[in-house]
Structure formats: C-alpha cells, structure tokens
Amino acid sequence: MYGNPSIIMGRKKLGDDGMKEQTCCFTGHRTIPTDKMQEIIGKTEAKVRELISEGYRCFIVGGAVGYDTIAAELLFRLRDGEHLDIRVILAYPFDGYTGPWSEEQKATYARLLPLYDERICVAAAASRGAYLARDRYIVDASSACIAYCTRQTGGTAYTIRYAAKKGMPVCNIAEDF
C-alpha cells in the first residue's frame, strides 16, 4: 500500500532534500488528559490543515506514546483521505526504545510502523542523549512545530526551547486550555 519505507540509520538530514520549508515536526507529552483528548485532536487537526493549505507536505513525528501517537494517527487519516500528497516520517531515538512500553502501547506502535513513508533512526545506541538528539533532529529538519506542552521541564519543553532558539514558529495547542 505504501511501498517499502526507507529505514535510515544515522544522521541523514531531511532538510537536505529541499523540503525543510514544507516540513513540520511534532512534540508533546507522553501523558494526555483523557478529558481533553478530543479537543487536543481537533486543535491539532485544525493546525495541520492550516499548514497543508500553506504548502506543507512533510510531517515528522518522534514516535513516542501520547502526543506523537495522536499526531501520527491524525496524519495517516488525512493522508489516506483527502491529502494523498503528504508524507509522514518517523524519527526515532534508537532501536529498541519501545522496550519499557506496555503491551498495548507496543501493539499500537507495531500497527502504525508500516504506515510511515520513511523511518529514521537517529542514534546507534540507547541513551538519554539519544532522545535529545532525536528532538534536535526533527527541529533541524523542519520550519514549523506543533506542540502539546503544559510544563516547563522535560523533553517537550526542551524541544520547544530549541525550536525557538532556531527562530522556528511553534504552535503550542495547550496554551488554549
């Protein structure tokens, strides 16, 4: 259905393909309040549709549970519906990073994995630094970021600060709650 997505080890730079100006990354918390889930999905979809109307065609997710999974599922739905021309890319920190996840989370990941147009492994070995390298990688390959961030600490906050330092516009949909 989607062909064989390329699996790339190491530091391939997505921006090298001339798509950076049409690429958006996602960052967000692993835990999402269930009472706000539909509103979060709706606000994310509205922003994605806005970016598509502006010419964005490539979307990068980090492959974590929570907001990354919400974004991926939304993007696949849009791509399989009216926006056949968008690409959905997974940039993950290292092989085996899903080890500590629950069986349900692993099953969701396994269901989504073949749907990505491209899969990029950022680091060769497991480390805390690999997660931060993945976060920098997705920002460096993008020109916009959609986030769900309610805290000033952690990986999501780090990614937003890194994007801001690079001058990238960040839409934090959590600011509306």
Predicted regions located by residue number:
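Acidic/glycine-enriched connector segments
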Residues: 14, 18-177
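Short, Lys/Arg-enriched N-terminal segments with co-localized hydrophobic residues
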Residues: 2-18
